[in-house]
Every structure is written in structure tokens, then in C-alpha cells.
Design a protein with these regions (language model features):
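Short glycine/serine/threonine-enriched helix-capping/active-site loop
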Residues: 138-141, 166-170
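N-terminal Rossmann-like NAD(P) cofactor-binding module of classical short-chain dehydrogenase/reductase
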Residues: 86-88
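Catalytic nucleophile loop
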Residues: 32, 96, 230
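Conserved SAM-binding strand-loop segment of SAM-dependent methyltransferases
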Residues: 69-74
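Beta-strand-loop-alpha-helix segment that lines the small-molecule cofactor/substrate pocket
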Residues: 92, 97-145, 159
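N-terminal Rossmann-like dinucleotide-binding module
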Residues: 2-65, 143-146, 234
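Contiguous beta-strand/loop segments that form the cofactor/metal-binding neighborhood of enzyme cores
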Residues: 150-151, 163, 168, 175-213, ...
């Protein structure tokens, strides 16, 4: 691994405190384009290169956010540029680890969308490679930088909730209608084989390209998409990062032609807390969030804010007090704070709020839930199995 560190060092551009960072973007679909818009709002950087296997995506990103940027089909061509300090990765999940490894070996710092891994076994070697390279890697669990989440954690650390034994997480999206179709894809402008990467070859399939997250070769469904956000918060707040047991079930009630379930539930047991997750593509009532239950109080937490409710002194049929004893509202999307934290750490070389170790632990929980889901409904660590 020493060669990796040496190679990375030879690529580094020496940055001064006031230098504008030079950024490249890989996988410039909808999410990455949003991240590019935030980079422009922050303004301490220049987007100098964009890369995507689909020409309309990269040209759209260039036109909207970086008219003077060079555009590339192959990430290798972008990464070999010695004038690029950092890359933002928004490619499908199965490309995350290969791209992170290539980037840090080329001396680039990395902001990568979650889940940081596509397979659970990718985690340890990824951590080792990033640590050896000395590069900054921020993973896209933006709650780690979102002010009201950080304030909520401070309350929990201060004992406001007492001993927490149960966390319910949920994410309901009214996305069923959006999943039925998508814009046409001009296959003459798509490098399909490049999109497949390490996945087995198959002829072009519109749904697998447009909705790749719902196919096992490219993503992990809601467990490694939505659940990863919330389980990361649960692990962060409770100090747990390794489940000891998991159960899960789910089905394809809405989209039977896909591979991953559209309706599911999971429960992960940790040494000091039980974390549950349920999700479906219907009914946006409640949206997504978490409920922490402790011996002194309960906390409802989501992207719009949080509220704390004192525990009742005796049993009551009143399931929720009318008035929260503590409440906070969020004023903006914390992704911009997460990106700003990344850019500041590129300059300072401090550890970011969601380093690779955090990203691997969050993704691991999603993988464990999928093991239970795809197996007999139960997962235990190998050493615990009979």
C-alpha cells in the first residue's frame, strides 16, 4: 500500500489557504447536479471537469453549472488531470468503491454519495486504502453536518431522553407514479458497457438504467438508499455501529418486474438499542424520519426539525402529549453544510463530519438488512451462527 501513498503524493497540487479548489464531477445525473449547484452557491471552488457515460447528462451539467469545464466519458481521463484537487461522485452504487479507490490513488479528495459501498466486503479494504492515501473522503450522509441534527445529538448526549432502548425509522415516498416511466434514453449517446462496469453484461434495458437502484447488480433498494441515512443517525446518536442480529421481510407489491422490494420492514439489534425501519413507495403521510424512545423522553426527528416529549409519569391512553417541551425547526437543506464541511477539510486536512469509516458503517447496516431480507428473514454475524 505504500506505493499508493507515494503515487497520491506525487499528484497533489499544493494548496494555499486562499486558493480556489478545482473540482471534477463523476456521474452527473440529477443528484450530482444538485451537488454542483451547491458548490456554485458556496463559491470557493471552480468546477473544471464533468464526466458521465450518458452525453446528455454531462452536457446538461456543464451547461447549467460549469460552462468552461471539460467533459469526459471515462473517469480515468478526468482523474489523470493533476490540476484537479477533489472529485464529487454521483455515479450508481456499484461504481462508488472503484471510483473512490481510483480517485485517492490519483491524489484527489472525494465527496461520494451514499451508500459508500455496494457490497459489504468492500468496506475494510476501502477504509485501509483511504487511510493509507491520506486523502479526505466525505460520504453523503448529510445529517452529520445538518445543524438541528447536531443539536439533537447534543441533547441526547446531555441525557435529556435518558436511556434510549428503541429507535423507529421510516421513509414513505409517494414515488410510485414516478417509477412507471421516464424520459426516453438515446442509446447512441450512452456508453452502456461502461455503465455496467463490473456487472454481468446484458442488453440495454431502459428500466435498469433509469431506475438502477432497484436492481441488485447496481444498487440495494431502499435498504441501502433511504435506510442508510436514518441508521447512520441512529448509530451516531446511540454510539452503536455493529448490529448483532437482524430480521427483515418485504415484497414487490407495486413493481413486480424489479428485483428489490418496494415495501419492506427491518429490525436491527445492537448491543444497547433496537433500530427498526419500514418503507414503501406510497403515502407521504409522515414522510421520513426517526423516533427515539428513552426513559425520560421521546424525540421525533426529521429533516424539517425535531421535537422532544417528556415521558408521562404514569400509564395513560394519551399516546402523545399535546405540547413538545423542546422543539427546533430546520431552515434549509443541510447538504450545503455537508459540502461546505468537505471543502473546508480539503483545505485544512481535518477529518470531515462523515469520513469513510462512518460511511462504511452506515452502508454495512443496510447490507445486513438486505442479507436478512434476501435470506430466510434473519441475519447473525458468522461467528454467532450454529
Amino acid at each position: 500500500m505504500g506505493a499508493v501513498a507515494t503515487a497520491a503524493a506525487s499528484y497533489n497540487r499544493i494548496l494555499g489557504a486562499n486558493d480556489r479548489l478545482r473540482i471534477g464531477a463523476i456521474g452527473t445525473g440529477q443528484r450530482c447536479q444538485y451537488l454542483l449547484s451547491l458548490l456554485n452557491k458556496i463559491g470557493s471552488n471552480d468546477i473544471v471537469a464533468v464526466c458521465d457515460v450518458y452525453e446528455p447528462h454531462r452536457l446538461e451539467a456543464k451547461a447549467k453549472f460549469a460552462p468552461d469545464a471539460n467533459d469526459y466519458v471515462h473517469s480515468e481521463d478526468l482523474l489523470e488531470r493533476k490540476d484537479i484537487d477533489a472529485v464529487v461522485i454521483g455515479a450508481p452504487d456499484h461504481w462508488h468503491v472503484p471510483l473512490i479507490l481510483a480517485a485517492v490513488r490519483a491524489g484527489k479528495d472525494v465527496y461520494c454519495e451514499k451508500p459508500v459501498t455496494h457490497r459489504i466486503e468492500e468496506g475494510p479494504p476501502l477504509i485501509a486504502a483511504v487511510q493509507e492515501s491520506k486523502r479526505i473522503v466525505q460520504t453523503g450522509t448529510q445529517q452529520r453536518s445538518w445543524e438541528h441534527y447536531r443539536n439533537a445529538k447534543a441533547l441526547i448526549d446531555g441525557g435529556v431522553l435518558g436511556k434510549i432502548t428503541f429507535v423507529r425509522t421510516y421513509w414513505y415516498q409517494n414515488h410510485f407514479a414516478n417509477q412507471q416511466s421516464g424520459p426516453p434514453i438515446d442509446t447512441s449517446k450512452l456508453d452502456w458497457r461502461r455503465f455496467l462496469g463490473t456487472a454481468p453484461y446484458r442488453p440495454f434495458n431502459h428500466d435498469q438504467y433509469a431506475h438502477w437502484r432497484w436492481y441488485w447488480d447496481f444498487g440495494g433498494g431502499a435498504m441501502t438508499d433511504l435506510f442508510v441515512h436514518w441508521v447512520d443517525v441512529a448509530q451516531w446518536f446511540t454510539g452503536n455501529d455493529m448490529p448483532t442480529r437482524a430480521t427483515a421481510c418485504g415484497s414487490k407489491f407495486l413493481l413486480p418486474e424489479r428485483q428489490t422490494p418496494d415495501t419492506m420492514s427491518a429490525a436491527l439489534l445492537y448491543p444497547s438499542v433496537l433500530v427498526e425501519f419500514d418503507s414503501t413507495l406510497l403515502g407521504y403521510i409522515e414522510g421520513g424520519g426517526l423516533m427515539f424512545r428513552g426513559t425520560k423522553a421521546a424525540m421525533r426527528l426529521h429533516r424539517r426539525g425535531f421535537a422532544v416529549y417528556d415521558e408521562l409519569p404514569a400509564y395513560s391512553e394519551s399516546y402523545e402529549p399535546d405540547v413538545a417541551v423542546l422543539e427546533a425547526k430546520s431552515t434549509h437543506d443541510g447538504t450545503i453544510d455537508h459540502m461546505r464541511n468537505f471543502l473546508e477539510c480539503v483545505q485544512s486536512r481535518n477529518t470531515p463530519n462523515a469520513p469513510v469509516e462512518v460511511g462504511v458503517a452506515a452502508a454495512r447496516a443496510g447490507h445486513v438488512a438486505n442479507f436478512a431480507l434476501r435470506g430466510n428473514g434473519v441475519w447473525m454475524p458468522p461467528q454467532q451462527k450454529a
